[in-house]
């Protein structure tokens, strides 16, 4: 549903016109050749394209060419007429195709010229010429007096001159058979050039176009040679115009030669690429097999550096261990020096507690034994270094003198 809505939103005026034309073709039930002619002579700003003209020409095998020419002239007259025949024609002129009528007229003349220049010589060309001669008054009077009342681009006079010039050219084709033969031969030559250039671009895009080899003279020489040719020459025989007549076998042979040449070139390029890749692979293998002395020196130097670094690391570890041992010793000395400050108040407190014990002081032997068992080794050493007065408590029973002497020893 969303895709349908998007398509409806993206519709333009050209899509709406195409839908209306399709509905009109279905309702009116036009013949296939009429539909092709209507498509080639519509009111679009472009065309008729070569595709449209080719579709018109292919109907010659199903429909006589004079019917196709008559229908083209009928469509031309319908858009030239200033007085509409019915209400439908009036609505079409005043609203639908207003400002674009001249395009239909010019395209009808282009289709007629295309039929004159591209049909086969003989009965087909005679049918078109007889039909145009029958309705010659359309070209002499209606086309010569045609006026463009309004144009969408505002170039009415330019379009009028173009339509009149095209009508005069068709009249010259009808009146001068030699001029018609010359133009038909020139048109065939140009069509052959276009076809050869298209084939060369498809089958030999990288090479120079070979179309110049088929045409060695320019248009001036062509015109100079064409003015004096025999009037009884058949239009199909174009050898006097230096136009090459190629058969289907020759074109197929040339096409095959182009394809074979391209295949041969591709095979050579592929062989060269494979050869280069093989040579590169062999060079790479040789380079890998030869040892690089520079790389070996680098590797040995790196191993030596690694062993040296390992030795240095071992020495560093030994130094660190020795340093750590020294630090441990210093830390022990520091601990032995600082421990008396922390433990001394405890002994003094115990001494004070003994002094404050009213039940009776404990014996000196008990206190010294308890102190010696509780004190660490560092304090024991320090006690040995104390004065004799503090150690020998049995000589004096004054507690305050012992405390005073102990404090002096600490200071």
Swiss-Prot record:
Biased composition (Acidic residues): 216-233
UniProt topology in membrane: Peripheral membrane protein
Protein location: Cytoplasm; Endosome membrane
Residue span(s) of domain ENTH: 25-184
Residues that bear N-acetylmethionine: 1
Record's keyword annotation contains Acetylation: yes
Pfam family, one: ENTH
Comp. bias intervals (Polar residues): 234-252, 335-350
Composition bias type Basic and acidic residues, residue spans: 351-365
Purpose of the protein: Involved in the recruitment of clathrin to the Golgi network and endosomes to form clathrin coated vesicles. Plays a role in the trafficking of clathrin between the Golgi network and endosomes. Binds to membranes enriched in phosphatidylinositol-3,5-bisphosphate (PtdIns(3,5)P2) and, in association with VPS27, is involved in protein sorting at the multivesicular body (MVB).
Residue numbers spanned by region Disordered: 214-264, 276-400
One of the protein's GO biological processes: actin filament organization
Organism: Saccharomyces cerevisiae (strain ATCC 204508 / S288c)
Sites of Phosphothreonine modification: 368
Keyword annotations from UniProtKB, A to Z: Acetylation, Cytoplasm, Endosome, Lipid-binding, Membrane, Phosphoprotein, Protein transport, Transport
Protein name: Epsin-5
SMART domains (alphabetical): ENTH
Low complexity bias: start-end ranges: 299-323
Gene Ontology MF annotations: clathrin binding; phosphatidylinositol-3,5-bisphosphate binding; phospholipid binding
Predominant place of localization: cytoplasm
Lineage: Eukaryota, Fungi, Dikarya, Ascomycota, Saccharomycotina
Modified residues (Phosphoserine): 322, 324, 363, 394, 401
Subunit (UniProt): Interacts with the clathrin adapter GGA2 and the clathrin adapter complex AP-1.
Miscellaneous comment text of the record: Present with 8100 molecules/cell in log phase SD medium.
Cellular compartments per GO CC: clathrin vesicle coat; cytoplasm; cytosol; endosome; endosome membrane; plasma membrane
């Amino acid at each position: 549903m969303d895709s349908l809505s998007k398509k409806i939103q993206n519709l333009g005026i050209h899509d709406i016109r195409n839908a209306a034309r399709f509905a009109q073709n279905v309702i009116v039930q036009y013949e296939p050749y009429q539909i092709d002619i209507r498509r080639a002579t519509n009111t679009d700003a472009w065309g008729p394209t070569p595709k449209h003209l080719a579709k018109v020409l292919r109907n010659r095998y199903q429909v006589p060419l004079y019917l196709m020419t008559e229908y083209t002239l009928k469509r031309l007259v319908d858009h030239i007429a200033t007085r509409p025949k019915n209400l439908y024609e009036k609505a079409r002129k005043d609203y639908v195709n207003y400002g674009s009528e001249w395009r239909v007229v010019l395209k009808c003349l282009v289709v007629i010229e295309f039929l004159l220049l591209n049909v086969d010589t003989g009965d087909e060309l005679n049918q078109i010429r007889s039909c145009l001669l029958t309705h010659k008054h359309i070209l002499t009077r209606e086309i010569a007096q045609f006026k463009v009342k309004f144009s969408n681009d505002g170039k009415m006079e330019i379009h009028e001159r173009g339509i009149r010039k095209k009508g005069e050219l068709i009249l010259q084709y009808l009146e001068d058979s030699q001029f018609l033969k010359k133009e038909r031969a020139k048109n065939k030559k140009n069509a052959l050039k276009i076809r050869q250039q298209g084939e060369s671009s498809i089958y030999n895009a990288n090479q120079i176009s070979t179309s110049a080899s088929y045409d060695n003279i320019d248009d001036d020489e062509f015109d100079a040679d064409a003015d004096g040719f025999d009037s009884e020459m058949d239009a199909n025989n174009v050898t006097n115009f230096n136009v090459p007549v190629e058969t289907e076998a020759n074109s197929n042979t040339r096409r095959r030669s182009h394809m074979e040449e391209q295949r041969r070139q591709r095979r050579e390029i592929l062989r060269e690429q494979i050869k280069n890749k093989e040579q590169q692979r062999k060079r790479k293998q040789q380079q890998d097999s030869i040892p690089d002395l520079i790389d070996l020196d680098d590797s040995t130097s790196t191993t030596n550096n690694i062993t040296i670094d390992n030795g240095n690391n071992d020495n560093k570890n030994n130094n660190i261990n020795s340093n750590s041992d020294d630090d441990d010793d210093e830390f022990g000395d520091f601990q032995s020096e600082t421990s008396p400050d922390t433990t001394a108040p405890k002994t003094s407190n115990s001494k004070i507690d003994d002094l404050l014990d009213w039940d009776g002081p404990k014996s000196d032997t008990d206190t010294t034994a308890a102190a010696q068992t509780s004190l660490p080794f560092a304090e024991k050493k320090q006690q040995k270094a104390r004065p004799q007065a503090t150690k020998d408590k049995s000589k004096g029973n004054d507690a305050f003198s012992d405390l005073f002497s102990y404090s002096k020893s600490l200071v």
